[in-house]
């Protein structure tokens, strides 16, 4: 009796775990047979004579053997069905993972301090079957990290080209990390709009590794960012990186903002309807049309907004345009704010506000009376006029150096009359300069003559030393001829100055007499 009850419990447990309908029908029939057998055994146990007990015992043994054989057959059928289900599941997983080859993802990497997820590229599916942490069959994927931070994560360049001579265990670089398919997460693309001061980032250095640092300043126009690298092993801790060489890291504040934005977006999506969305679109279009129409009747200043950014590296007008500002309209959501920037004003030093108001009233209430911009423009006009006068005055002024360059060093006249006119003009020009200026010019020309004579002596020595080289002799002769012409010009200047000085000395003697 106890054996029948134990067999009945086993059948009931198998019936709870059975998933196939045919198997459940067989188990139900076996359960009914056992229940009937138990009922008959209880009913006939008291009425049967003692001499029939051995025959009854034999029948019970036969029934027990039959029951065991049926249970073993059911277990074999269940195990074969489970194996078929597992093979079908693995085939589906391999098909799914094979289609993912070449896609980007976020894969885990085991560091000495824990597990961290990094962006990676799926490059293949491994043949080995594993059981994940949840006890479910899974396949492994081979991934290459796109932002490696350690040497063991750095992809082998020879392996990518199919020319690596080492296997995965002996190569110092990565041939691809093996991760389970269930641990793969969604790819996190870099969001450069998050770049701001003190933002943690990964920066790419020449060693092909991504090092951690913090942002110092960002230039969104040229897409350049200055980063201070963490650690003391970098010679230049502050460097400029392009946006393509940076990967902004996610902070706790970003996660909170994303969660709040997702919650608000989902609540708004549930509360709004298609009709409300269309109404909002119509209102937005009407608002923009009204803003454009308003800009046509708005006061147009002489300088456009943001014109000063032409001389600076400011990006204020570009940021305003990205935030929805329409050029020509005023500030504010309705476009009725100011159009021109608030100008700076400087009040007179040491004067009270009442005195400043009196000065403004005396100027007929001019609001720009103390404007810095007006003062700067006035100063620019005065400086421009002064520069023009100075230019005219300097252009008309003729000093002794200009005279010598124009008259003495200039091209000579071809006729006798022109030479006489030039000499007369030269004499008149020299007479206009003081004796001190003539003395200074005489000393300068004497120094030039001595320097030119030394150069001629060096060229002459070179001619004597290189008498066998025809090409060099030709070049040296050209130099010698040029030096002679310059020396003749300087000597002519010296004679003119000496003549003028001698004339002045003679006049002084005559006046003293």
Swiss-Prot record:
Organism: Drosophila simulans
Protein's UniProt name: Zinc finger CCCH-type with G patch domain-containing protein
PANTHER family named among the record's database cross-references: ZINC FINGER CCCH-TYPE WITH G PATCH DOMAIN-CONTAINING PROTEIN (PTHR46297:SF1)
Listed Acidic residues bias regions: 252-261, 273-283
Region (Disordered): 252-283, 477-513
Domain G-patch positions: 312-358
Bias kind Polar residues: ranges: 477-495
Location relative to the cell: Nucleus
């Amino acid at each position: 009796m106890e054996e029948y009850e134990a067999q009945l419990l086993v059948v009931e447990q198998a019936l709870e775990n059975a998933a196939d309908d045919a198997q459940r029908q067989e188990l139900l029939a076996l359960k009914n047979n056992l229940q009937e057998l138990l009922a008959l055994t209880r009913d006939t146990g008291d009425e049967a004579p003692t001499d029939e007990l051995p025959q009854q015992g034999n029948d019970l043994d036969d029934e027990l053997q039959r029951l065991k054989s049926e249970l073993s057959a059911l277990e074999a059928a269940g195990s074969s069905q489970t194996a078929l289900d597992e093979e079908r599941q693995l085939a589906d997983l391999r098909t799914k993972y094979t289609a993912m080859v070449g896609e980007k993802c976020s894969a885990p990497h085991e560091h000495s301090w824990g597990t961290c997820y990094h962006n990676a590229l799926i490059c293949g599916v491994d043949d080995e079957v594993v059981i994940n942490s949840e006890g479910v069959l899974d396949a492994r994927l081979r991934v290459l990290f796109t932002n490696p931070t350690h040497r063991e994560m750095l992809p082998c360049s020879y392996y990518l080209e199919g020319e690596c001579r080492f296997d995965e265990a002996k190569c110092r670089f990565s041939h691809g990390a093996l991760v389970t398919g269930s641990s793969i997460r969604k790819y996190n693309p870099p969001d450069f709009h998050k770049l701001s001061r003190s933002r943690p980032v990964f920066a790419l250095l020449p060693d092909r590794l991504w090092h951690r640092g913090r942002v110092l300043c960002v230039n969104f126009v040229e897409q350049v960012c200055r980063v201070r690298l963490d650690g003391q092993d970098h010679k230049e801790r502050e460097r400029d990186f392009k946006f393509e060489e940076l990967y902004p890291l996610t902070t706790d504040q970003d996660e909170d903002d994303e969660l709040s934005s997702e919650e608000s977006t989902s609540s708004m999506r549930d509360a709004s309807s298609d009709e409300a969305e269309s109404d909002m679109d119509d209102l937005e279009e009407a608002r923009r049309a009204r803003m454009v129409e308003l800009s046509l009747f708005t006061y147009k200043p002489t300088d456009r907004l943001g014109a000063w950014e032409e001389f600076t590296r400011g990006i204020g007008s570009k940021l305003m345009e990205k935030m929805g500002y329409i050029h020509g309209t005023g500030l504010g959501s309705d476009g009725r704010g100011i159009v021109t920037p608030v100008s700076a004003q400087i009040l007179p030093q040491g004067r009270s506000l009442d005195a400043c108001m009196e000065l403004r009233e005396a100027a007929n209430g001019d609001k720009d009376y103390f404007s810095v911009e007006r003062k700067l423009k006035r100063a620019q006009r005065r400086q421009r006029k002064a520069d023009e006068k100075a230019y005219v005055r300097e252009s008309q002024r003729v000093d002794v150096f200009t005279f010598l360059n124009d008259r003495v060093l200039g091209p000579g006249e071809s006729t006798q009359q022109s030479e006489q006119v030039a000499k007369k003009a030269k004499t008149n020009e020299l007479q206009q300069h003081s004796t001190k200026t003539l003395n200074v010019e005489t000393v300068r020309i004497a120094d030039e003559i001595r320097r030119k004579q030394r150069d001629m002596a060096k060229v002459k020595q070179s001619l004597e030393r290189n008498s066998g080289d025809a090409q060099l002799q030709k070049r040296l002769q050209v130099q010698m001829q040029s030096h002679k012409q310059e020396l003749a010009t300087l000597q002519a200047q010296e004679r003119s100055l000496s003549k003028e000085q001698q004339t002045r000395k003679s006049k002084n003697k005559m006046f003293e007499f």
